[in-house]
C-alpha cells in the first residue's frame, strides 16, 4: 500500500509504571527507513512496541524482531517453516541463503542459536512480503559477515524499516533518516 502505515500523535509511552517518552508524534510511511538512536534505557524498544501496536496492521504485514528471543521461540519458528507449503518454504530458504545460512542445515538443528533465530524470523517476514519491518538491535548475536548480509537484504527490502541499534555503520547503510531518543524526548 502507499501512504501511511503508522501514526502516533502526541503520545506518552509508558514503560513499567512511568512514562519513558512524552509528546511523541511520528508518522511511518511505506518508504520510511528510520534509525532510532539513543542510550540504553532511553525508550527505543518502548517506541518500537508502541509503533507496532499503533499500526493496526496484522501480524502478517509487520515483522517485529525483538532484541531477545528464547530457544523455545526459535523452535516454534522452525516448526512454522517446516509446516509451510513448498512454495512458501522455498521463499524462506532463499532469504536464509541470502543471509548466509544454509537452510537445510538449519532445519535439522534442534535448537537454533540466537543469531540463527534472528535470521529465521527475518527470512519468514521478508519471504511473506511484510509491509513494515521493525528490528530491535538486529546485529546482536551476528558475526560481521552475517551483519553485512543482513544489511544488503534490508537495503533491497522495498517496505518500511524502523530499527533501534547502537551500530551506526549498519544504520547508515540501511536507513535514510534517524531520530535521537533521550531524556524522555524524541528529536
Please identify what each model-predicted range represents.
Residues 2-187:
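ABC ATP-binding cassette signature C-motif
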Amino acid at each position: 500500500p502507499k501512504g501511511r502505515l503508522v501514526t502516533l500523535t502526541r503520545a506518552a509511552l509508558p514503560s513499567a509504571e512511568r512514562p519513558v517518552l512524552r509528546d511523541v508524534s511520528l508518522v511511518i510511511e511505506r518508504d520510511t527507513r528510520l534509525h532510532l538512536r539513543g542510550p540504553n534505557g532511553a525508550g527505543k524498544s518502548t517506541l518500537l512496541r508502541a509503533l507496532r501496536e499503533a499500526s493496526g496492521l496484522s501480524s502478517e504485514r509487520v515483522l517485529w524482531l525483538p532484541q531477545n528471543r528464547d530457544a523455545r521461540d526459535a523452535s516454534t519458528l522452525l516448526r512454522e517453516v517446516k509446516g509451510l507449503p513448498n512454495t512458501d518454504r522455498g521463499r524462506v530458504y532463499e532469504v536464509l541463503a541470502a543471509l548466509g545460512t544454509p537452510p537445510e542445515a538449519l532445519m535439522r538443528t534442534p535448537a537454533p542459536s540466537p543469531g540463527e533465530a534472528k535470521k529465521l524470523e527475518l527470512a519468514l517476514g521478508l519471504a511473506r512480503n511484510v509491509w513494515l519491518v521493525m528490528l530491535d538491535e538486529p546485529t546482536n548475536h551476528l558475526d560481521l559477515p552475517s551483519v553485512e548480509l543482513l544489511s544488503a537484504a534490508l537495503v533491497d527490502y522495498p517496505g518500511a524499516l524502523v530499527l533501534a541499534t547502537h551500530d551506526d555503520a549498519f544504520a547508515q547503510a540501511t536507513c535514510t533518516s534517524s531520530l535521537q531518543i533521550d531524556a524522555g524526548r524524541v528529536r
